[in-house]
């Protein structure tokens, strides 16, 4: 899943899904998982070097966590998300499916990100993000497409 488009990843998986094909999680050995016993991973995830995953985190299927991503406690991430380098996701965050979080973006604690949301590079999300929208800036604001 090292493809930078959440939608393209979902289309590829849809076309090649087959009971005879396994999709392992690929986790770099430098990834720091705080509480292995209380983490749930789906399938087909790619977790790159120097990521940090705290306790009680749920990660769905076919997500890409690029270099240096940090995920806080009690967070849930759905399917087909692309999270770019050095993104910080605070504790208690809920992220839907097919989202793109730009380089060095930050999501504050207990926020919800819907589906098909794009969060711009270096943006600071301080409010919930609704489906099918683009948010940019500090603080991140809804941009009209």
Regions found by a protein language model. Name each.
Residues 26-143:
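Structural signal for interior beta-strand "rungs" in well-ordered beta-sheet cores
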């Amino acid at each position: 899943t090292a493809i930078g488009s959440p939608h393209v990843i979902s289309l590829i998986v849809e076309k090649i899904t087959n009971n005879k094909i396994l999709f392992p999680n690929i986790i770099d050995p430098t990834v720091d998982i705080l509480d292995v016993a209380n983490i749930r991973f789906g399938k087909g995830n790619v977790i790159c070097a120097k990521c940090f995953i705290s306790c009680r985190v749920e990660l769905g299927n076919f997500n890409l966590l690029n270099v240096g991503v940090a995920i806080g406690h009690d967070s849930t991430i759905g399917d087909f998300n692309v999270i770019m380098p050095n993104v910080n996701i605070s504790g208690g965050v809920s992220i839907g499916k097919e989202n793109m979080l730009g380089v060095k973006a930050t999501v504050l604690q207990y926020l919800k990100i819907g589906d098909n949301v794009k969060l711009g590079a270096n943006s600071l999300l301080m409010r919930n993000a609704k489906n099918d929208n683009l948010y940019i800036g500090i603080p991140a604001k809804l941009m009209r497409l």
